[in-house]
UniProtKB/Swiss-Prot annotation:
Annotated organism of origin: Sorangium cellulosum (strain So ce56) (Polyangium cellulosum (strain So ce56))
Name the UniProt record assigns to this protein: Fluoride-specific ion channel FluC
Record-annotated membrane-spanning stretches: 4-24, 36-56, 100-120
Catalysis: reaction(s): fluoride(in) = fluoride(out)
Alphabetically ordered keywords of this record: Cell inner membrane, Cell membrane, Ion channel, Ion transport, Membrane, Metal-binding, Sodium, Transmembrane, Transmembrane helix, Transport
GO CC terms in record: plasma membrane
Length: 127
């Protein structure tokens, strides 16, 4: 039951952080393109890559902390459903090019961010 609590608390923190960053991005860059969702997914991919690498190669994270950070915080922070909804809206109301650009940018940049997170974690662990 304790793990559920920490996952839920992490999820709440991640959701609030996502809302804050998405709102800031929309105010800063406008609402013509889903910059906020792209930002949270790229940052979340990087952090999840780092968390996964640290959990796999060290004993720095207890199983409960790992779940709280990965499933909780990163699960609440990142958002695949918003990515889907915003991409559909771009295609439906703006242009196919904007929707396809969102798909390509999100997939490529998030994968690269995840790998970069793993590499950075490895280097930090190695000293």
């Amino acid at each position: 039951m304790e793990r559920w609590f920490w996952i839920g608390l992490g999820g709440a923190a991640g959701t609030l952080a996502r809302y804050g960053l998405s709102t800031w991005c929309q105010q800063r860059f406008g609402a013509e393109f889903p910059y906020g969702t792209l930002a949270v997914n790229v940052i979340g991919s990087f952090l999840l890559g780092a968390i996964g690498e640290i959990a796999a190669t060290t004993e720095l994270l207890s199983p409960t902390l790992r779940l709280s950070l990965s499933t909780g915080v990163m699960g609440g922070f990142t958002t695949y459903s918003s990515f889907n909804n915003e991409t559909i809206r771009l295609i439906e109301y703006k242009s196919w090019a904007a929707g396809l650009a969102n798909i390509a940018i999100t997939l490529v940049v998030c994968l690269l961010a995840g790998v970069l997170g793993m590499v950075v974690a490895r280097r930090l662990i190695a000293g």
